[in-house]
Amino acid sequence: MSKSKALLLVNLGTPNKPTYFSVFSYLREFLSDYRVLDVPGPIRFFLVNFIICPFRSLSSSKLYKKLWKRNNSESPLIKHANTLKSILNDRLDDYEVFYAMRYQNPSLKNVINSIMQSNPSEIVVFPLFPQYASSTTGSVFEAFTTELSKYWVVPKVTFINQFYTNHKFISAWAKKLSSYDLDAYDKIVFSYHGLPNSHVDKVYMNGLCADRNCESNFNEENKFCYKAASFHTTKLIQERLGLNAEKCITCFQSRLTKNWLTPFTDSVLEELAANNQKKILVLAPAFTADNLETLIEIDAVSYTHLTLPTIAIV
């Protein structure tokens, strides 16, 4: 490596193939992480291997096949990672850019080994999650440090734990939204990936997230609360564009149970349709690359039963 430093981009992961067994393998690795499914180990093992994966892999593999088909038989997450890596390698003089997935491939273990073969003076670890969550950024940190600690020589490490307040991130979203006629839409829906309420409650030493009014109160205490960060992201983008706060809705998708962050995206869209507010613009500021959640789950096709004549996905 001619460049003296390494930049490691990390995203969540994707199945190697859109098949039942490949999806099973991905889900098993993902859900076996205690930071993702925070229940006692024996219960987690039973749920993952005998309840969740055997059944969910079947339905999920069908969705991944649909996703692959739309993207020339490849994972969009891998495609975007390769593109980003190539662009940054061309632009950064001092850094050799690598990317890894927290789950599946390319694995953190193999990519860290490739980095260490080049004896870098510094590794900058950049999890591609704008808002901190233990189940994403926290998990990447633990997995990365576990692997790196196996090496005798440990270089300087810089770890980026969240970046949603970075003005360039906000400007990028504002620029993208500016390409739409925002006045033509009844509502602008900011849809973030959901989390169990228990995950955000653990951010606080005392009390619960619900006690903090995280929808409008952003401070030092809740700066790593995913719910607060999500609402804050919406506010920053809304203010950058000079949008009326009443026009913007923050919500959360991909829930597994009712005990996840609310309001739920599907419920919000159903309510908007019922109230005859049918020109909707949807964006997903928790995602830095398209994947199943943005190309399939939020896709307009998913909401045809709502009779929304105009629903645009940013």
Model feature map: region roles:
Residues F98-A172:
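Long, hydrophobic, well-ordered secondary-structure blocks that form the structural core
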Residues K109-I112, T257-Q277, S302:
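A short, acidic, amphipathic alpha-helical segment used as a generic capping/interface helix at domain edges
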Residues K3-Y99:
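N-terminal glycine-rich anion-binding loop in soluble enzyme alpha/beta folds
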Residues N197-A245, L256-P263, V268:
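Redox- and metal-dependent alpha/beta enzyme cores, enriched for Fe-S-associated oxidoreductases
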Residues I280, F287-S302:
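C-terminal functional regions that serve as terminal interaction/effector modules
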Residues L84-E96, Y151, T233-K247:
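A structural motif corresponding to the C-terminal end of an alpha-helix
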Residues T304-T310:
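Conserved small/polar residues in nucleotide/adenosyl-binding loops
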Residues V140-A143, P263-S267, I296-A300:
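Charged helix-capping and loop-helix junction motifs
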